[in-house]
Regions:
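Alpha-helical transmembrane segments of multi-pass small-molecule/ion transporters
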Residues: 1-66, 71-296, 300-352
Length: 352
C-alpha cells in the first residue's frame, strides 16, 4: 500500500514533481542514446493510437475510476450551489481562459523564443489541459483542506460524466479557432478509449466487488491494492513521451519554462475565481476549497492521452501537456496552503 505522510498526501504524490523530473531526464537520455527503443515502440499503433501508450494510460485512469462512487449523484440536489460553482468554473470559464492566457504568452509575449508552428502546438496542449478538470487528485487536495468527502465525490462524479459530452466539442471549438486540424473521429475515439472504457470498467468493478465483498472491503482493502498503479503508469508514460521528445528538449530547454508560465498563471486564476465565488455564495469551507481545487487542477492523464492520439508522441502538444504534470503538484500545494490560511473567510463546516 502506498505510504502516506502525516499531511495526508501519499509519498509518491507529495514528491510527484521530483519523479516527473527524473522521468523527464531518463526519457531524454533514452531518446538521445537509445533511439531504437522509442522507434521500436512507435511501430505498435492502431488508428493513430499508440498501443503501448494506451496500455500505460489505462493503468493511470482505471484505478481512479474505481474510487468514484457514481451512486453519489443521487445527492446532487443537496447544497447545489457548490456544484454550480464547480460546473460553471470548469466548463464555462476555464477552457476559454486557458486558451486566452496560453495564446497571449505563446504568440505575443514569448514570440521571440517560440516559433509560430511550435506555439500552435503548445496552445493545443494547453487547451487539452484546460478542457479536462481534475478527477482522482482532487481527493488528495480535498483531504489536505479537510473537505467534505461525500460532497467531493459528487463534484468529481458529475464532472466525470460532463467530460463525456463536453470535452470533445470544447476542444474542437477552441482548436478550430486556431485553425488546428483535429479529426472528429480521432478525438471521439480518444475520449472513448481513455474515458468511457476505464470509466465503465471502474463502475463494473465497483458493482461486482460490492456485491461479492461489500462496500467496506472495496473502500478499505480492494482500492488499496491499486495504490501506486496510477503513479507508475503515469511515470512510465512520461519516460516514453520524453524519449520521443529528447532531441526537441535538448535543442530548446528554455521552452519547458516558457510553457510552464501560462499554465501556472491559469491555475492560480481559476482557483481564485471558484474560491471567491464560493465565498460570495457563503458556502462552507469544506465545500468551497474542493470546488476551487477541482477547477485549478487538471485531468492531465486524459490531456496527455488525447495529445498523443491527436498529434503524436513526439509532438509539441504532447510536450505541453507533460509540462502540466510537472507543475501540478507544487502549485496545488501552494493553493492548499492559501485555502487553509483563509478558512476563516467561510461559514462553519457542513460535516458533523
Amino acid at each position: 500500500m502506498e505510504t502516506e505522510t502525516k499531511s495526508g498526501i501519499g509519498f509518491f504524490q507529495k514528491y510527484l514533481t521530483v519523479w516527473v523530473a527524473l522521468c523527464m531526464a531518463a526519457g531524454v537520455l533514452i531518446g538521445k542514446f537509445l533511439p531504437g527503443i522509442p522507434q521500436f515502440l512507435n511501430r505498435f499503433e492502431y488508428a493513430k493510437v499508440s498501443i503501448p501508450m494506451a496500455i500505460l494510460i489505462w493503468l493511470m485512469i482505471y484505478p481512479m475510476m474505481i474510487k468514484v462512487d457514481f451512486q453519489s449523484i443521487k445527492d446532487v440536489g443537496k447544497n447545489p450551489k457548490g456544484l454550480f460553482v464547480t460546473w460553471i468554473t470548469n466548463w464555462v470559464i476555464k477552457p476559454f481562459t486557458m486558451y486566452g492566457i496560453a495564446a497571449l504568452f505563446f504568440f505575443v509575449i514569448f514570440k521571440a523564443w517560440i516559433a509560430p508552428e511550435l506555439a500552435t502546438e503548445y496552445l493545443a496542449g494547453a487547451v487539452l489541459l484546460g478542457a479536462a478538470p481534475c478527477t482522482a487528485m482532487v481527493f488528495v487536495w480535498s483531504t489536505l483542506t479537510h473537505g467534505n468527502p461525500a460532497y467531493t465525490v459528487v463534484q468529481v462524479a458529475t464532472n466525470d460524466l460532463i467530460i463525456l459530452v463536453a470535452f470533445v466539442p470544447i476542444v474542437k471549438l477552441l482548436l478550430g479557432v486556431s485553425n488546428i486540424a483535429v479529426p472528429w473521429d480521432t478525438l471521439i475515439l480518444s475520449v472513448a478509449l481513455f474515458v468511457v472504457v476505464p470509466l465503465t470498467a471502474g463502475m463494473l468493478t465497483r458493482t461486482f466487488v460490492i456485491r461479492k465483498k461489500g462496500v467496506e472491503y472495496l473502500e478499505n482493502t480492494f482500492i488499496g491494492k491499486f495504490n501506486g498503479v496510477t503513479t507508475v503508469g503515469l511515470l512510465l508514460t512520461l519516460v516514453l513521451v520524453f524519449a520521443f521528445q529528447g532531441e526537441t528538449i535538448l535543442k530548446n530547454p528554455l521552452h519547458i519554462v516558457l510553457i510552464a508560465v501560462p499554465l501556472i498563471l491559469q491555475t492560480f486564476l481559476i482557483f481564485l475565481i471558484a474560491y471567491l465565488a464560493a465565498r460570495a455564495l457563503k458556502l462552507p469551507f469544506d465545500i468551497a476549497a474542493p470546488a476551487g481545487m477541482i477547477g485549478a487542477s487538471n485531468f492531465f492523464e486524459l490531456a496527455v492521452a488525447v495529445a498523443i492520439a491527436l498529434f503524436g508522441t513526439s509532438s509539441a502538444a504532447a510536450l505541453a501537456t507533460t509540462v502540466g504534470v510537472l507543475t501540478e503538484v507544487p502549485v496545488m500545494l501552494v493553493l492548499v496552503k492559501i485555502a487553509n490560511s483563509t478558512k476563516h473567510w467561510f461559514p462553519e463546516s457542513t460535516q458533523n
